[in-house]
């Protein structure tokens, strides 16, 4: 696919359970992925490792929401040691920027002073949140961002957190793998639900986020 693939096409893809990827950062093509097995993180079964919970309570970073979306996507698209290639190319980056402009994409950011040291971004429709990518230049920064995201989704009334695939990194938090048919059933229910990404206050503490997760389990 090329520039003829629009942001409205992308929204339609999400609604039917398909997501975009590129082979490489400098490959302009977009491929649509519809895996037989899908990673999801059940919001009523999130596990926060004890050491990470202690760190989150200690407020190691300032958490900001949607303050530097483009910078988060750019950081996720940047090659780093251990991750020499990325699936985020320029057309995909542009499409997510358009979703953000419509209020349909969000970032959770970890800041140390005025330095962005970690974060994640994803797409929200109805009661669904599709986690797209995360990055970290400091220990635990992406994990802290994920836990703050989870707390925000729980408080906001979301029903589905789609991680696309399951990885060892995500598995430690309770991510599971489900069949395509099961995923589509869950997607259909959550898509029409009402949720509010901003229901949790922007300055919510780590303790408040952990409490929300605990109450949902």
From Swiss-Prot:
Example GO biological process: protein catabolic process
Entries under InterPro entries matching the protein: Acyl_CoA_acyltransferase, Leu/Phe-tRNA_Trfase, Leu/Phe-tRNA_Trfase_C
Localization annotation: Cytoplasm
Signal peptide feature range: none
SUPFAM superfamilies per the UniProt record, alphabetical: Acyl-CoA N-acyltransferases (Nat)
Similarity annotation: Belongs to the L/F-transferase family.
Protein name, UniProt field: Leucyl/phenylalanyl-tRNA--protein transferase
